[in-house]
A protein has these predicted regions:
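Acidic (Asp/Glu-rich) sequence patches and key acidic residues
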Residues: 1-209
């Protein structure tokens, strides 16, 4: 749970992958973001994850369902692993070298997996980090992926630059997590026989609103 930016697709021209990576390195250096350049062989069978958005439990929120299959890879996985802030997830800007498509590779045990949907959660970092990541993705899209690169920001900031909406969503999620923590603690204490006061419904309502 937390405000997340999702992105997928490819550069419009695979021949410009090196130029796009140079631009991303320039952005990292200008903003003081640590990063690592990565280049790996990606070959053989991989379990492929496909994600689909569905309506979520709250108004204007979405959930994601996952489908799996198998695919054969014969390419290289190139790009950057970027650290915008210690309290932000790593921003992985990794591409299939052949078609400059955004690609995420993972290995769990003996299983290699691939996904073509990327994301970065910014909930716990300062909101300025969310804004900065959106600026970098806007530049990547404008200069290299106008036709094929898709970005979806759960807060809507990428699309609208509405800071108030971003801050409200962060606050709503933080309040929901606080409520969940309170309720979980009540259940845990009740399970071991302690007497506890139930959560104040009026206080919870005020926090959410």
């Amino acid at each position: 749970m937390g405000v997340t930016i999702h992105f997928h697709g490819a550069l419009d021209d695979p021949a410009r992958l090196d130029a796009a990576l140079a631009m991303l390195r320039e952005e990292c250096e200008r903003r003081g973001w640590p990063y690592r350049s990565l280049d790996f062989e990606a070959c053989g069978p991989h379990e492929m994850y496909t994600f689909h958005q569905v309506p979520g439990p709250l108004l204007d929120w979405t959930d994601v369902i996952t489908e799996t299959g198998m695919t054969e890879l014969d390419t290289r996985w190139r790009g950057l692993s970027i650290e915008p802030h210690p309290d932000c997830e790593s921003l992985l800007m990794m591409f299939d070298e052949h078609d400059a498509r955004l690609m995420l590779l993972t290995t769990v045990g003996d299983t290699n997996s691939v996904s073509y949907c990327m994301s970065v959660k910014t909930q716990f970092a300062p909101p300025e980090i969310h804004v900065a990541i959106c600026e970098v993705l806007h530049r990547l899209q404008d200069e290299f992926g106008h036709e094929k690169l898709i970005v979806y920001d759960e807060s809507g900031y990428f699309q609208t630059q509405d800071m108030a909406a971003l801050l409200k969503m962060r606050d709503d999620i933080e309040a929901a997590m606080d409520d969940l923590e309170t309720i979980t603690r009540v259940v845990q204490l009740g399970a071991i026989g302690d007497e506890v006061e139930p959560p104040d419904e009026d206080a919870l309502y005020e926090r959410r609103n």
